[in-house]
Amino acid sequence: MSDLPLAQAHGRFIRGSASKVRRVLDQIRGRTYRDALIMLEFMPYRSTGPITKVLRSAVANAENNLGMDPSSLIIKTASADMGPSMKRYRPRAQGRAFAIKKQTCHISIAVAPSNQSTTTEASD
């Protein structure tokens, strides 16, 4: 395991299913901060908005709390876990009601400095 510090951010109780959020997180995991922002901007999914907010928060934590350079950060971990479901009811014919589950999820993103920048500094 590497000894590089990680900066994390969490978005909790985000409306949307965890599986749909994971579909986007799988695309940006391991990429640089700049590449991830560009990808998120042009993806046609609704979950890119909350993911962008959590990613920017993780980078702000890295910059302010750990003094890292945002241009050298890569996304180390990105995960989405299921949150509680909000239960709603839709009225139907003859006095019946159908249950509707509005799913939520928790988004976690951790960023770390890329190994390329640290190895080039060490070799100089």
From Swiss-Prot:
Pfam families: Ribosomal_L22. Part of the 50S ribosomal subunit. Belongs to the universal ribosomal protein uL22 family. This is Large ribosomal subunit protein uL22. One of its GO terms (biological process) is translation. The keyword Signal does not apply. InterPro entries: Ribosomal_uL22 (IPR001063), Ribosomal_uL22_bac/chlpt-type (IPR005727), Ribosomal_uL22_bac/org-type (IPR047867), Ribosomal_uL22_CS (IPR018260), Ribosomal_uL22_sf (IPR036394). This protein binds specifically to 23S rRNA; its binding is stimulated by other ribosomal proteins, e.g. L4, L17, and L20. It is important during the early stages of 50S assembly. It makes multiple contacts with different domains of the 23S rRNA in the assembled 50S subunit and ribosome. Keywords: Ribonucleoprotein, Ribosomal protein, RNA-binding, rRNA-binding. GO terms for molecular function: rRNA binding; structural constituent of ribosome. Signal peptide: none annotated. One of its GO terms (cellular component) is cytosolic large ribosomal subunit. It comes from the Bacteria. It comes from Prochlorococcus marinus (strain SARG / CCMP1375 / SS120).
